[in-house]
A protein has these predicted regions:
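Conserved SAM-binding strand-loop segment of SAM-dependent methyltransferases
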Residues: 1-10
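Conserved Rossmann-like nucleotide-binding pocket used by diverse enzymes
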Residues: 4, 22, 51
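A short acidic, Gly/Pro-enriched loop at the edge of an enzyme's catalytic core
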Residues: 9-21
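A short SAM/SAH-binding and catalytic strip from SAM-dependent methyltransferases
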Residues: 19-34
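A short glycine-rich, Lys/Arg-flanked "PGG" loop and its adjoining helix->strand segment in the class I
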Residues: 34-49
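Conserved catalytic/acceptor-binding region of the Class I
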Residues: 51-123
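Core SAM-dependent methyltransferase catalytic element
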Residues: 105-108, 168-184
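C-terminal helical/coil "lid" or tail adjacent to the Rossmann-like core of SAM-dependent
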Residues: 110-165
Length: 184
């Protein structure tokens, strides 16, 4: 097995070289995810597999709507996710499109699944959401997408062990390069 680090936008891939190509948490950050999927699919040998995984934030919600932090968490997420989508920074709802990207890339034997995880405030997983929000906060603030108090409230919720939430769906989609040809 050879594991490689690769920049899908600038580094060439050898056509038909790999039995398996996998990417995770990448495509939602790209302006043209289909082109990236096609590039990766072209690197898979006939009979090999492409597996792509990314988030869909449709499920992001407080697990207990009666928790004192739930309403602010929900309201702020409801403002930020459409803002990030409209700004082109990332596509927070890309996960639901992964199966169609695999099909559009010409792969066969396609499949998909989605898993939502329950996160507890103060956990490492909740910290990941907090840090991601922290990195994106300056842009949200400068464009008026959210106030500092709202961002602070979400940050406090993700650090509060009494608060829990459903995180983004982790969507996986896969397909096989046909043995009689290549992916598109």
């Amino acid at each position: 097995m050879e594991v490689r680090r690769h920049d899908i936008l600038t580094d060439p891939l050898e056509p038909g070289r790999y039995d398996l190509v996998n990417c995770r948490a990448l495509l939602l950050h790209l302006a043209d995810p289909l082109q990236a999927v096609r590039t990766m699919a072209a690197a898979v040998r006939p009979g090999g597999w492409l597996l792509i995984e990314d988030a869909d934030y449709v499920s992001l919600a407080a697990a207990n709507p009666d928790h004192p932090r739930a309403a602010r968490f929900h309201q702020t997420a409801g403002k930020l996710l459409p803002f990030f989508a409209a700004s082109g920074t990332l596509d927070p709802f890309l996960g639901r499109r992964l199966p169609s990207l695999v099909t559009a890339a010409g792969l066969a034997e396609t499949g998909s699944e989605a898993i939502a995880c329950h996160r507890q405030g103060g956990s490492g997983e909740a910290e990941l959401l907090r840090r991601s929000l922290e990195r994106m906060s300056p842009m949200a603030l400068s464009h008026g997408a959210a106030a500092q108090e709202e961002l602070d409230a979400v940050s406090a919720a993700t650090a509060d062990p009494s608060f829990s939430f459903l995180d983004a769906l982790n969507v996986a989609a896969w397909g096989r390069v046909p043995c009689s040809g290549t992916a598109q």
